[in-house]
Amino acid sequence: MKNKTHKGTAKRVKVTGSGKLVREQANRRHLLEGKSSTRTRRLKGIVEVDKADTKRMKRLLGKA
């Protein structure tokens, strides 16, 4: 049987040209009044998926 792409993962994770996986930071969608500006600033931008999770993520994306 063919492997299928896990659509929830596909919406959250992108593969870069060099094959790295990047994702957005969590905790920056709502209820921001209670979070400090330092914290929300730190959560800005995209980060690389942790090395421990990369193999599993690639399998969910149908890349391996």
Curated annotation (Swiss-Prot):
Gene3D superfamilies: 4.10.410.60. The gene is rpmI. Residues 1-14 have a biased composition (Basic residues). The keyword Ribosomal protein applies. It comes from Corynebacterium glutamicum (strain ATCC 13032 / DSM 20300 / JCM 1318 / BCRC 11384 / CCUG 27702 / LMG 3730 / NBRC 12168 / NCIMB 10025 / NRRL B-2784 / 534). One of its GO terms (cellular component) is cytosolic large ribosomal subunit. InterPro entries: Ribosomal_bL35, Ribosomal_bL35-like, Ribosomal_bL35_sf. Belongs to the bacterial ribosomal protein bL35 family. SUPFAM superfamilies: L35p-like. Keywords: Ribonucleoprotein, Ribosomal protein. The lineage of its organism: Bacteria, Bacillati, Actinomycetota, Actinomycetes, Mycobacteriales. The keyword Ribosomal protein applies. One of its GO terms (molecular function) is structural constituent of ribosome. Residues 1-29 are annotated as: Disordered. This is Large ribosomal subunit protein bL35. One of its GO terms (biological process) is translation.
